[in-house]
Every structure is written in structure tokens, then in C-alpha cells.
């Protein structure tokens, strides 16, 4: 079991349904496990829940609700598996995601930060062990000129096991 911090976006119903429709076809690893989200703190197995909750509550006080716009898909080789991922990348709101991520990786999480993996704010919408399939998925998305507007007003601290995500605390920005 690991702890993870997720930003679950507020989306218009049509955008949520469109994302879920795409994920149902192309997100074989996570569609049935977790809702559309942005990962702010990646799996941490070594910190207890109360300590992480306190840290996130303290760090989140520096932030308010913010908006983002997704307009572009990009593929990225997973750092944790042999899969390639398809990400929707926020064109607007990008810097706030980065600052939020950086604020979380201070104090007790400072040594958990993977400096060998660049942080790219993203919403995962697809994955496959065949990188060329992922490239085709991303090309399909980018041809559509998507524009998905959403907001982030809270962070969820979750327990993550292989096929299970359970929210243990919601922290409002």
C-alpha cells in the first residue's frame, strides 16, 4: 500500500463523459481503478497517513482554486513499467500544477522526489505496451483540437493498492 495525492478536476459533464469514453477504450491499466485526475504526489510507501495529511494540509494553504485548459495530448514512456502513457497536458494552469507539486515535495516528502523523472502535469487518458499505438491515440486527440476547461479546488490523499484507490482525506485549496 502506498499513499498518493491526487487533484480530481471539476469538469463539465460533457467533457467528463468524453474523457471517460476515450479512457474506456484506451486506458487499460487505470480506467477501472481511478477517476480522471492529476497526480501531485506519486506513490509514497514509507510515510504514515497522519503525517502526510498534516503535511498536505499545511502546504495546500498557499493555494486557491485554479483553472486549467487541456488542449494537447502527449505520449510519455512510463518510468514505472514497460508501458507508454497518453497524457492530456494543461496549456493553461501548467505553472500552478508545477508550483503545487513543488510545494508538496518539501519537508517530509523532500527525499521522496524522483529527480530523475521530470514532472509533467497531466491527466492520463491512455496507455499501451506498444508505443506506436499510443502515438496514434495522441495523434487522434490532437487532430480534434480539444479544449477542456476545468478547475482544481481540492486534493485527495488516497491509499493506492494494485487495483484500488480509496480516499482517506480531502484537503481544500
Provide a role label for each language-model segment:
Residues 1-173:
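Histidine-dependent nucleotide/RNA phosphoesterase domain, centered on the 2H-phosphoesterase fold
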